[in-house]
From Swiss-Prot:
Chain positions recorded as glycine 2 binding sites: 250
TM region positions: 269-289, 295-315, 328-349, 472-495
Protein name: Glycine receptor subunit beta
Keyword annotations: Cell membrane, Cell projection, Chloride, Chloride channel, Cytoplasm, Disease variant, Disulfide bond, Glycoprotein, Ion channel, Ion transport, Ligand-gated ion channel, Membrane, Phosphoprotein, Postsynaptic cell membrane, Receptor, Signal, Synapse, Transmembrane, Transmembrane helix, Transport
Length: 496
């Protein structure tokens, strides 16, 4: 019994909770929903009778009480001419990746509807400003943007629609729209390109027998002080045209278009792309002035240049659409990358020459021949070495050492005749003036009364660099800048 009562209580509470939730939702919907406006043709005679007879509301009611918005003006007669003009509030930059642009505009349409002529007893101005809620009670052109990707109306703080009814039956509608329009781009000359972006206004359902769009005379598109971050747009570059289209099976549909000519500003790419890549290429040429045997300095410099240019190419490729043709910027980046890579290849050729044994021996022979011609080579050079090994010693030093050895060694009764050979067996980096005949280091004076350091080694011999390796670096210093300058002359003369 208690269990059944508990279940009944639980079911009752659930029903009460659901009913409360439903009431709360309905109240929220009622608050958020705007009050529905009924056109005069939809109102009852009692409601119309409550309106004062001499009021403007009564005049509008008299105009619209028998008005059918489903039927166009001049039905079965001449087509309705709709005069169109546009005021551009803002113009967004072109997006290269999506190939579109966004504009915020006031779209204005004006046409004549004889059914809306103001009565003769209407006193006041020649135009009657009407609340936007009445817009849905009128017939209106079925205009749409043919190249539109997305669009939206504005309703902050009220619907941004302006409606005028003139005494002669002319109707003027102005509405604020934000539209994203497609713009197919030709990026062959990017970033020195000029783009032509269209805005096409077309009738959706009425053929040219019923409706015609006409640009307003004068300046149908008003453009005031619009600055774009990457493009220049001028009022003089705006073109107007007719784009009436034929659709098989239905006929011709009226269409008008405006073409915006946008010239890209190159300053951003000059500072952000061209200048850095040019400096990287020039930086890669510094290796031509570094000693050919300094591979620890030249190789990292070349690799850094190539990697920096490759990274720049990858970054820009991610920001641009993937097109099948080569852009002007691609030509520049590829050329810079090739110049950086060529400087690295040039050092590889220098290394081949530097490590070629035949060329090294030939260079040694050339140096020896040159010294011999100057009187410093041949036998004289051989005599001034320890044991003919090539280690230089002064003649005076050799004589002093020999004299010392003779004095010391001849006083020994057990000295063998071949003990003087120790002089010839000394290490090649020993100076005889610093050692006795037994190879022991001694202190000698340097002529100023000060003892010289023991076991003083001569400076290391300079590596032999073949002339061919030096000549390659010499040619590269002139050839690379000249070729890059020639490329710049051709490049800028074509693309600028």
């Amino acid at each position: 019994m208690k269990f059944s009562l508990a279940i009944s209580f639980f079911i009752l509470m659930s029903l009460l909770f659901e009913d409360a939730c439903a009431k709360e939702k309905s109240s929220k919907k009622g608050k958020g929903k705007k009050k529905q406006y009924l056109c005069p043709s939809q109102q009852s005679p009692e409601d119309l009778a409550r309106v004062p007879p001499n009021s403007t509301s009564n005049i509008l009611n008299r105009l619209l009480v028998s008005y059918d918005p489903r039927i166009r003006p001049n039905f079965k007669g001449i087509p309705v001419d709709v005069v169109v003009n546009i005021f551009i509030n803002s113009f967004g930059s072109i997006q290269e990746t999506t190939m579109d642009y966004r504009v915020n505009i006031f779209l204005r349409q004006k046409w004549n509807d004889p059914r809306l002529k103001l009565p003769s007893d209407f006193r006041g101005s020649d135009a009657l400003t009407v609340d936007p809620t009445m817009y849905k009670c009128l017939w209106k052109p079925d205009l749409f943007f043919a190249n539109e990707k997305s669009a939206n109306f504005h309703d902050v703080t009220q619907e941004n629609i302006l409606l005028f009814i003139f005494r002669d039956g002319d109707v003027l509608v102005s509405m604020r729209l934000s539209i994203t329009l497609s713009c197919p781009l030709d990026l062959t000359l990017f970033p020195m390109d000029t783009q032509r972006c269209k805005m096409q206004l077309e009738s959706f359902g009425y053929t040219t027998d019923d409706l015609r769009f006409i640009w307003q005379s004068g300046d149908p598109v008003q453009l005031e002080k619009i600055a774009l971050p990457q493009f220049d747009i001028k009022k003089e570059d705006i073109e107007y045209g007719n784009c009436t289209k034929y659709y098989k099976g239905t006929g011709y549909y009226t269409c008008v278009e405006v073409i915006f000519t946008l010239r890209r500003q190159v300053g951003f790419y000059m500072m952000g792309v061209y200048a850095p890549t040019l400096l990287i290429v020039v930086l890669s040429w510094l290796s031509f002035w570094i000693n050919p045997d300094a591979s620890a300095a030249r190789v990292p410099l070349g690799i850094f240049s190539v990697l920096s240019l490759a990274s720049e190419c990858t970054t820009l490729a991610a920001e641009l659409p993937k097109v099948s043709y080569v852009k002007a910027l691609d030509v520049w980046l590829i050329a810079c990358l090739l110049f950086g890579f060529a400087s690295l290849v040039e050092y590889a050729v220098v290394q081949v020459m530097l490590n070629n044994p035949k060329r090294v021996e030939a260079e040694k022979a050339r140096i020896a021949k040159a010294e011999q011609a100057d009187g410093k080579g041949g036998n004289a050079a051989k005599k001034n070495t320890v044991n003919g090994t090539g280690t230089p010693v002064h003649i005076s030093t050799l004589q002093v050492g020999e004299t010392r050895c003779k004095k010391v060694c001849t006083s020994k009764s057990d000295l063998r005749s071949n003990d003087f050979s120790i002089v010839g067996s000394l290490p090649r980096d020993f100076e005889l003036s610093n050692y006795d005949c037994y190879g022991k280091p001694i202190e000698v004076n340097n002529g100023l009364g000060k003892p010289q350091a023991k076991n003083k080694k001569p400076p290391p011999a300079k590596p032999v660099i073949p002339t061919a390796a030096k000549r390659i670096d010499l040619y590269a210093r002139a050839l690379f800048p000249f070729c890059f300058l020639f490329f710049n002359v051709i490049y800028w003369s074509i693309y600028l």
